[in-house]
Amino acid sequence: MKELILTLQKEIIVPVEMDKVLPEVIENMSLEEIKNIELVQGRKRIKVADIFDVELNDIEGEPRIVIKNSSPKLKYIGSKMTKGEIVVEGDAGMYVGAEMKGGKIVVNGNAESWAGQNMKGGELLIKGNAGDYVGSAYRGDWRGMSGGTIIVEGNAGNEIGEFMSKGLIHIKGNVGIMAGIHQNGGIIIIDGDVDVRVGGEMKAGAIVVYGKVEEILPSFKFEGIVENPVIKLSKKDAGTPIAGTFYKFSGDYVYNKPKGQLYISVDSNPDLI
């Protein structure tokens, strides 16, 4: 298989869309063919070799792309990818991993907003911070993340998991407002603190918060205190065990018969109830 190493030659101002450079695309291409792949930059089209130094190696296993000296101006990295691996050495722009179906993306830096948007499968690992709308839907759409795993080792912004229906989002830092808004399934785990309106208008799925919460919406029902719960999202679900002692809430009761589950750490929120 092929390993493609792209080294950004200099700082770019106008964003470049990287959705044409995918592991499954380059695995059967020659070096010259890769250099001539067209990318959209603003109102014009450029070639890969116009902004990158390009190196192609033979490796064992799945096809792999490494982007060195990366920039937040590089958008749509790994968009719709189905296999292989992409490693981003630096920051990634908006829509990294959007609609990805398989494979793995590792961002050794921060990611801009809409990381993993409408993600369907695969794994997205962000070792820095992420912007707003992690694992969310497109503007005006009601279909968010439907599979796969997103892990953010830093903080994330607002409205993570919007309209999420399946999969896992794990934020190891803090998050902003409206985490899990309109959530329809899947699990969101937040190790840090959460701002207001967590789980707003969720119908199903689960949100676990180990840090502090600013509030619980009045449309959620307190179900009691649970220890080391096993989260089951359906009758056939084997369950996901969660360590700790939690306040359990159900909701959001702005809907009829909601199945959403909130688990809020007792240790971090001793005065919540």
Swiss-Prot record:
Catalytic activity: N-formylmethanofuran + 2 oxidized [2Fe-2S]-[ferredoxin] + H2O = methanofuran + 2 reduced [2Fe-2S]-[ferredoxin] + CO2 + H(+)
Domain of life: Archaea
Enzyme class, broadest EC rank: oxidoreductase
EC number: 1.2.7.12
Keyword Oxidoreductase belongs to the record: yes
Region (7 X 13 AA repeats of [GW]-X-X-[MQ]-X-X-G-X-[IL]-X-[IV]-X-G): 78-211
InterPro entries named among the record's database cross-references: FMH_DH_FwdC, Formylmethanofuran_DH_suC, Glu_synth_asu_C, Glu_synth_asu_C_sf
Sequence repeats: 78-90, 97-109, 116-128, 142-154, 161-173, 180-192, 199-211
GO MF term list: formylmethanofuran dehydrogenase activity; transition metal ion binding
Family the entry assigns: Belongs to the FwdC/FmdC family.
NCBIfam families assigned to the protein according to its UniProt record, in alphabetical order: FMH_DH_FwdC (NF042910), one_C_dehyd_C (TIGR03122)
Full protein name: Tungsten-containing formylmethanofuran dehydrogenase 2 subunit C
Organism: Methanocaldococcus jannaschii (strain ATCC 43067 / DSM 2661 / JAL-1 / JCM 10045 / NBRC 100440)
